Amino acid sequence: MNLKEKTRALFAEIFGYPATHTIQAPGRVNLIGEHTDYNDGFVLPCAIDYQTVISCAPRDDRTVRVIAADYDNQVDEFSLDAPIVTHDSQQWSNYVRGVVKHLQQRNNAFGGVDMVISGNVPQGAGLSSSASLEVAVGTVFQQLYHLPLDGAQIALNGQEAENQFVGCNCGIMDQLISALGKKDHALLIDCRTLGAKAVSMPKGVAVVIINSNFKRTLVGSEYNTHREQCETGARFFQQPALRDVSLEAFNAVASELDPVVAKRVRHVLSENARTVEAASALEKGDLQRMGQLMAESHASMRDDFEITVPQIDTLVDIVKATIGDQGGVRMTGGGFGGCVVALIPEDLVPAVQQAVAQQYEAKTGIKETFYVCKPSQGAGQC
């Protein structure tokens, strides 16, 4: 039974009438462009075929009733006519409530909804299960009540809910790719303008995500420190963001910067250039060049941005040794653990899976989790 069938069956069973719509919003993986988003730079994510699915129907009153199928059918119920506040014990409820509260501030022309939610985006793997939930909930209200909101506005609404209601600082990439993703394509996103260009993925290439299942604590504080170092770099060049600094300008004065700040700046500037070039390499089907750019990205994250860990570097080395120049692999996500992403010809996937299974646990004492994904369509009816 797939997620659509599961949520529709549960909807009829619990609410006693059939759902009118089923909406999905996908998770994502970022192929290249790491820690560039909050520097107003470029990212190149694709939506993946793991998603949040919501079966729903409009109500004729002002009540929102929500069932979380993945949390033992926990229930949340709130009124659109009372101030929406955080739930004291159900964290998942706050993503739903936050999206609805911020939607009210954007366009209040909607009434109550019944919904049943289920998803298969792995949680805590950096594949954006929360953004997928936020975008799915926003799309439910937009579709049921024909709200004049486009994908970018639904994405921004989700980001606001996560930043201001849930209280988690995030860029816009995760919500934007979930809302705007295109089947068989990646999306080159300009994080300053929110402009997005679809980039076709070469045929016969698998998107492989491998979770190292290693996570260092203090990730939040490390993230903030790196962000501050980038802002210090932008101030040095008297620019609003590192997006506005050229590599030439940086190289001319790099020795005058604090050495650590200089390394952080060099990563962001070189990563932005790599990301734009990667989009054109993918478009041309040049997997070899894409692989080189992913390798350079990983080395830059390891040596200049200093956000990789030995477990992640080991995983990258195992995959690289197996695929040679026939694809690419790098750490993806915030850093200090998490996942690697690889672009691999489909016929090489079994060899990569076998090599990782044989070597990673032996070298690190941790068992990996392996996902093979397809670039998928963004949010909408399913």
Swiss-Prot record:
Active site location: D174
GO molecular function: ATP binding; galactokinase activity; magnesium ion binding
Keywords: ATP-binding, Carbohydrate metabolism, Cytoplasm, Galactose metabolism, Kinase, Magnesium, Metal-binding, Nucleotide-binding, Transferase
InterPro entries reported in the protein's UniProt record: Galactokinase, Galactokinase_bac, Galactokinase_CS, GalKase_N, GHMP_kinase_C_dom, GHMP_kinase_C_sf, GHMP_kinase_N_dom, GHMP_knse_ATP-bd_CS
Compartments where located: Cytoplasm
Residues that coordinate or bind substrate: E34, H35, T36, D37, Y223
Chief site of localization: cytoplasm
Site keyed Transition state stabilizer: positions: R28
Entry EC number(s): 2.7.1.6
Keyword Nucleotide-binding tagged: yes
GO biological-process terms attached to the record: galactose metabolic process
Binding site for ATP: G124, A125, G126, L127, S128, S129, S130
Domain of life: Bacteria
GO cellular component, one term: cytosol
Pathway: Carbohydrate metabolism; galactose metabolism
NCBIfam families noted in UniProt: gal_kin (TIGR00131), PRK05101.1 (NF003472)
Family: Belongs to the GHMP kinase family. GalK subfamily.
PANTHER family (UniProt xref): GALACTOKINASE-RELATED (PTHR10457:SF7), MEVALONATE KINASE/GALACTOKINASE (PTHR10457)
Protein name as it appears in the record: Galactokinase
Organism: Salmonella gallinarum (strain 287/91 / NCTC 13346)
Lineage: Bacteria, Pseudomonadati, Pseudomonadota, Gammaproteobacteria, Enterobacterales
